[in-house]
Amino acid sequence: MSVDKIVLAYSGGLDTSVILKWLANEYECPVVAYSANIGQIEDWDAVKEKGMATGADKVIVSDLQKEFVEDYIFPAFRASAIYEGTYLLGTSLARPLISKEQVRIAHAEGANAVSHGATGKGNDQVRFELGYIGLDPSLQIIAPWRTWDLNSRTRLEEYAKQHNIPVPTTKKNPYSSDENLLHISFEGGILESPWNEPDPDMFKLTVSPEMAPDKPTYLEITFQNGDPIALDGVAMEPLELFRALNKVAGENAVGRLDLVENRFVGMKSRGVYETPGGTLLYHAHRDLETICLDREVMKIRDSLVPRYAELIYNGFWFSPERELLQMTMDTAQKTVSGVVRMKLYKGNCFSVGRKSDQSLYKEDFATFEADDVYDQGDATGFIRLNGLRLKINALQGK
C-alpha cells in the first residue's frame, strides 16, 4: 500500500526534525508534524515555526495535560502502579496518550501512516507502535531509526546541514531527557556507567536535599475513591492539584530516584528520575489504603500490581488485560476516601496522620487498654488450629 500522508510525533529536536525532512523526501507526500503538550517546558510557537520551516505540511500542537492527569496518571495511581518496586512509570504512561492523539489526528487529516522518532534499542518504539496497533491496525507505521543509515548524531547533524535544518549552537545537553507533568528522566552520557553519581546541576524539578527548607512542611491530601480531590482542604481540579503537589514536593527535594531497570527489549538501562508530585501522591495514597482496604482485598490487589505495572511499562495500555485489571483496581478503591497528613523534609516524605469515614481501624478493638469487645482467650483456639499442620509436620519428621 502506498503512503499518501504521514502524521509524525514531532518534538522539534534534532532527531524528529531530521525525520520530518527525511519522510517528506523519502515518501514524497505531505507530513503533518504533531506535538503533544503533556506538561513539558517548551516554546510551542518556536516548535510550530521550526516544523513548518523544516517541511511540514501542517504543525499541530495538542494540549493533553488535563487528559494525561485524569485518564492516565490517576488511574495508575489508584492501582498503586510501580515498576520493579521503584519506577512510577512517568514515560510509560505518557506514550499511549501520545499515540492515541496521533491516531486521532491521522483520522482527522486523512493520513494512512504514522511515524515516531524512537530508536531501535529502547522501550518507546514498542509503546508507540503497540498503541497504534491497538487503536487502528490499518495505519502504516514508519520507524526511521530501524531502516535508515543515519545511525549517529554526526550523521544526523550532517543531514541537517545539507537540508538547512537548524542545529542548536548552544552547549549540548549531555543527557537524553524526557519531561512531562509526572516526571523528568535522564539517561545516557556519564549516566551510562551505573557507578557515576548524577551531576547535582542536572535536576530541574526538585531542589537538592541540602538546599531544601530546614523546617518540615506539613500538608493534607483529601482522597475520594482513590483519587486526590483537595489539598489542605481546598478542592481543586485534577490538573491544578497535581501541579500543586509537584511544586510543594519539589521545593522539599522529594522525588529523586536513581535506578537500573530492565527494559522490555531485553537490556538493562540506568535512569535518573525526578517525580516530585507523583512520589508524594503514591505514598499518601498507599497510607490511606492501610485503614480503608480490607486485608484480603489489599493482598489480592498488591499481588496484581507487578503485572499491571509491567503491562504499562511494556506498552500494553490498550490491551484487554490492562482494562480488566483496571476495573479490578478501581473496584478496590470504592472505599478509599479520607484525608492523609504528610510531612516533607529534605527529600523525605512521611505519612503522619490519616482519617476516613470508611476506616476499618477501630480503636476499641486495637487498644492495649482493657476493652469489652475482644476476648483474648479466643486467641488460644485460633493459634491451635493454625498450628495444626505445623504440629503434624513436626510429628512426621520425628
UniProtKB/Swiss-Prot annotation:
PROSITE patterns: ARGININOSUCCIN_SYN_1, ARGININOSUCCIN_SYN_2. Signal peptide: none annotated. It is an enzyme of class 6 (ligase). One of its GO terms (molecular function) is ATP binding. L-aspartate binds at residues 119, 123-124. ATP binds at residues 9-17, 36, 117. L-citrulline binds at residues 87, 92, 123, 127, 176, 185, 261, 273. It is found in: Cytoplasm. Its main location: cytoplasm. InterPro entries: Arginosuc_syn_C, Arginosuc_syn_N, Arginosuc_synth, Arginosuc_synth_CS, Arginosuc_synth_type_1_subfam, AS_cat/multimer_dom_body, Rossmann-like_a/b/a_fold. Pathway: Amino-acid biosynthesis; L-arginine biosynthesis; L-arginine from L-ornithine and carbamoyl phosphate: step 2/3. GO terms for cellular component: cytoplasm. Its EC number is 6.3.4.5. It catalyses: L-citrulline + L-aspartate + ATP = 2-(N(omega)-L-arginino)succinate + AMP + diphosphate + H(+). PANTHER family: ARGININOSUCCINATE SYNTHASE (PTHR11587:SF2). This is Argininosuccinate synthase. The lineage of its organism: Bacteria, Pseudomonadati, Thermodesulfobacteriota, Desulfobulbia, Desulfobulbales. The gene is argG.
